[in-house]
Amino acid sequence: MKQIWMILVSLVLMTFTGPGGFAAETAKTSLEALQAAFNGESNANAKYLAFANKADEDGYAGVASLFRAAAKAEEVHLTNHAAVIRRMGAEPKADIKTPEVKNTMENLQAAQKGEIYERDEMYPAFIKLAQQEKNSDAQKTFRFALAAEGGHARLYGEALNNLENDKIAKEFMVCPVCGYTAVTLTGSACPVCATPAEKFIKIK
């Protein structure tokens, strides 16, 4: 009986574990959500840098640039999350897992899946928690991340569709304030946070 109970607990934990190795859906407060998001973004940053190295090895320069740009965006997000955590009197904590690196196509698929999860499930739930607590700082950092993750999911999808025809951009631009990521900017400022275009970080 005890063995069966342990198996059930393990299955529940697996169900609630997000792509960064954290139990995002178990967060009950905005602080817990911030810690989960910080952990997730920290793991995503490490994972995308590893994926970039593999893409370089596989000869996909554009995909490598995309992964590096996404890693920089996740760095922006984890920095923003950490700042709010500290303002709430806590210290950010991350459990960095060794990334599982496969071939570049599989890495793109895994990355897109993680971004879709954050876009459709994780960050909307975290924003709701922050709204319930009227935590405006948490709402802001979550909304910044949500906007960027949606863009990352789209960019990964485009990269998958163009993986073999070499039509993937070799340079990307990342907003240093919200992490918005794009190949080019259509205006003079970030469409998410209004940071001037000249402050964007160029990633190759």
Predicted segments, located by residue:
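Non-heme di-metal
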Residues: 22-204
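Positively charged n-region of N-terminal signal peptides that target proteins for export
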Residues: 1-4
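Bacterial N-terminal signal peptides
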Residues: 7-17
